[in-house]
């Protein structure tokens, strides 16, 4: 988005953030009761791919998926109609978030492969009727905050020159910010794929994406005081969401390794987070982010096998998410008034449907030590 749309850089950033936090308290409840819940992942990925095709901004993409989730939660919709609903949600979201020139045109939508493969043709009248039904369903209110609306504001303080990487001062602050943004974007897409993240407030998901990125990049302290103040979330309130994100990252890494035919001993080297000071210099390599054509968002950071041997295993210690990061617990004792607690979470818990096709294949464990591949920094 252009500079005029970057509200997080302006003088009113704090006020806008507070307004968004207030609005998210009034978000509609999501029950996860759609009969087509097993198709939700496909259509969420479809929206993501189409939005990338038209270079729509992340808030438009996330708003479109959120509109689709709420609409599917209330209606029993056929597969053919779901294509129409998904594209209509994307159109409404793009009209709300983007400039007029960026909104996809009818002929462009009809030329999409998913439409031709299904022998579907959208008409202007059909789209208008569906948009009207969507607007009436949401009571003409599209100002629905998502995690993408908060992430840039939190990223503005996600990396600071006082942060340490594996106990060492950072050499290149701008490069670190670049990789922080890339990982935060990846975790945002992870949260978009699983409806279970609707059980958390959007601002909490955004904060967890930043925290997860800092863990992957081995920045310390993991959740500094400035981020506690900025987000109004303490570490303990983020842990559960962080674990879901890191579990998805773990599965993506394993799947990428499996596709490359890597052996099990190589995969098991990706098991611990570094918290101790390194004994020798390490090097920074750039991860790649690809959106697969099969409507599966994979994290191919593991597709560079040489990176598994970059990090020394002689100076590692396990990082347990259950406890507060070292040096942080005592520094935030006076910030209790910033905590939002349960009030920032959605009121209705998500029902786990047995027909859901989820990307996670392991049970949730509070003490899990999550595997990851970590880009390292030049010395």
From Swiss-Prot:
Disulfide bonds: none
UniProt-listed SMART domains: CYCLIN, Cyclin_C
Key word Secreted present: no
Transmembrane helix keyword on record: no
InterPro entries: Cyclin, Cyclin-like_dom, Cyclin-like_sf, Cyclin_C-dom, Cyclin_N
A Pfam family recorded for this sequence: Cyclin_N
UniProt keyword list: Cyclin
Domain (Cyclin N-terminal): residue spans on this chain: 15-143
Family according to the record: Belongs to the cyclin family. Cyclin J subfamily.
Protein name, per record: Cyclin-J
Organism: Mus musculus
Gene, per the UniProt record: Ccnj
